[in-house]
């Protein structure tokens, strides 16, 4: 859940590291209204 996510803009390697681990390797804010905690941009790793 979100409680286990790193803060936004923190480095990430896997999707589990943060709510949205994007291809840049940085945690991003949640941007998906339908699936909170998921981003509409690509994950670095699922």
UniProtKB/Swiss-Prot annotation:
- Compartments where located: Secreted
Keyword Disulfide bond annotated: yes
* Entry comment, domain topic: The cysteine framework is XI (C-C-CC-CC-C-C).
Which residue positions does 4-hydroxyproline occur at?
A: 2, 11, 29
Instruction: Give the protein's recorded name.
Output: Iota-conotoxin-like Fi11.8
The principal location of this protein is secreted
According to the UniProt entry, its GO molecular function terms are: sodium channel regulator activity; toxin activity
**Which cysteines link up through disulfide bonds?**
5-19, 12-22, 18-27, 21-38
Tissue distribution = Expressed by the venom duct.
Record PTM 6'-bromotryptophan, positions in chain: 33
* Modification sites for D-phenylalanine: 44
The protein's job, in short, is: Iota-conotoxins bind to voltage-gated sodium channels (Nav) and act as agonists by shifting the voltage-dependence of activation to more hyperpolarized levels. Produces general excitatory symptoms.
InterPro entries, per database record: Conotoxin-I_CS, Toxin_19
Pfam (any one)? Toxin_19
Query: Which UniProt keywords are present, listed alphabetically?
Result: Bromination, D-amino acid, Disulfide bond, Hydroxylation, Ion channel impairing toxin, Neurotoxin, Secreted, Toxin, Voltage-gated sodium channel impairing toxin
The major lineage groups are:
Eukaryota, Metazoa, Spiralia, Lophotrochozoa, Mollusca
Q: Does the keyword Acyltransferase apply?
A: no
A cellular component term (GO) from this record? extracellular region
Family membership, please give it.
Answer: Belongs to the conotoxin I1 superfamily.
What organism is this sequence from? Conus figulinus
